[in-house]
Amino acid sequence: MVTVERVARPRPDNAIERRIWDVAATVVDPEVPVLTIEDLGVLRSVRLADDGIVVQITPTYSGCPAVDAIRDDIVTALSAAGHRPARVEVVLAPAWTTDWMSESGRDKLERYGIAPPAPRRADGVIRLGLGVRCPNCGSLHTREASHFGSTSCKALYVCQRCQEPFDYFKEH
């Protein structure tokens, strides 16, 4: 039986790796600049290797155009903080899931005007399609205007109450 990890990874126990994690965790997603890669759950691991630091990330989807920018920003942030040479590895399995997004990240999305994905229930119960909550007025009376929003990981919705369009971060 294969199990897929559906939770965010904890910060490292090792003090040096934890400091490196803390620096890498400050890198923001260039497509959703209100979120860090830690908020998104994209930052997967940090470890020390003989040739430097290895940071692993899992993009929100395999063709994410932000991967190169995130990789460069991690290396730049670590270098600016005085850490030895770093390389970033992109890990595609297990695939990223919105379950890895932190509660803080979900709150930041909503305050930014993007409806966050609903958290998956641990007991396996499937959430009924009750509507996506409008981040502007809180109404559940919304409709999908386009399955594709400003980025591939978002859909465009319109609130029927306040008439405002908004992005919805798709569940994965």
Predicted regions and their residues:
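Domain-level signature for proteins that mediate thiol-based redox and metal-cofactor handling
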Residues: 1-172
